[in-house]
Amino acid sequence: MQFKLLQRDFSSPLTMPELDFTVQRLSNRQPGGPDQATITATGSERALFELAEWMQCPVMLYDDHNDPAWWGYLDTLEINVGAIRLAVRMDQVFNRVAVVYSYVAPGSASVGTRATTAWVQDDDSVALYGVHELLLSISGATAAQAEAARDAALAMYKLPITTVEVNPGNAQNGATLTCSGWWKSLSWQYFGESGTSSVETSAQIAAIVVAEGAFLTGTLIEDASGISSSEYRQGDQSAQFCILELLASGTSSGRKLLAEINRWRELRIWEMPDRSGDNAEIFIRSDGQLDGISGVDVLAQHAPVGVWGLLKDVIPSSLDTNKIADPGLFWVEQAEYDAVTGVYRPIVAGAWRFGSEIKEG
């Protein structure tokens, strides 16, 4: 598999001739699509440290046919040089902050009504990384106290924080890049809606993406939910949380509503297919080989999820499937592909792990 780190504007790949990259593993989940990927890098110390300049840059992984297999951004970087390990993480970056507090007037012992400070942001950080919001909560505070807490949090978290560890084992020089899918970016901003109309849930999802999906290009609704609910949102939950709530109600036909970020960074919405072998998209043989409808020999490298799978030539025909659910048919909720061993590991609905490792066919 091939790894590419792109410019922040999603244009041409960055050129890093002093570094060699190796894809270790990737995973997908439903809902969301691309979840995590791990890549290791070796090369000069200078080039390893310069990777920190590219935090949150877009990442693409390509299969052995040079087709996109996974997409996301650089989320965490760990650098090992001699006895020193440095880690840089994006999940503690907050460049736009406000504080919710219960007001207590000076000289009073009673807690007043809920109040919220104005939002403040660091424009340089926002220009570099986009908006990462944090809504803190303080009980029994004055307005000045809440604003001081807000300003302190912004100063502390506006840029990625580097942690340092001493590793006496003197590990080999190198870096580990942990990447996250763009679904995670929907957790960076809160979503509020003052309207109180009853709106179809998939249309509400599309509206949330327009409002808060800064790194997404739009929504692709293949199947409308057919269910309506109040559009009102107080504004103290993330956009991702609001979308998950709307997905949870499913469709009017009683099936799950699925979501993934596709390769064009659209949030694709569709209905879970009926439980039927006719709807199976992946097939697992008794020797562990993974096949697809089109017979793509690199299917495992895409770690397919949100699909029905079927065991092929495994379950004996004598088994009475009127007494148990068809054991040969399963729904893949999560999956990981180990790029080193070529093994596909699905996790099926019901939170149990498929008993054998699935090898790349």
Model-predicted regions and their roles:
Residues R8-P34, V126-V166, D274-D291:
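Short beta-strand/loop turn elements enriched in aromatics
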Residues P17, Q30-I39, V99, Q172, ...:
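Amphipathic, non-transmembrane alpha-helical segments in extracytoplasmic/periplasmic proteins
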Residues Q2-F3, M60, H65-V93, Q172-S187, ...:
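Short beta-strand-centered interaction patches in the first periplasmic/extracellular domains
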Residues M1, S11, M16-S27, V81-L128, ...:
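Acidic, low-complexity/disordered segments
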Residues V88-D151, A155-Y157, S197-S230, A239, ...:
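Intrinsically disordered, low-complexity terminal/linker regions enriched in Pro/Ser/Gly
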Residues M16-V59, D63-D67, A152-A153, N170, ...:
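Extracellular/virion structural assembly segments
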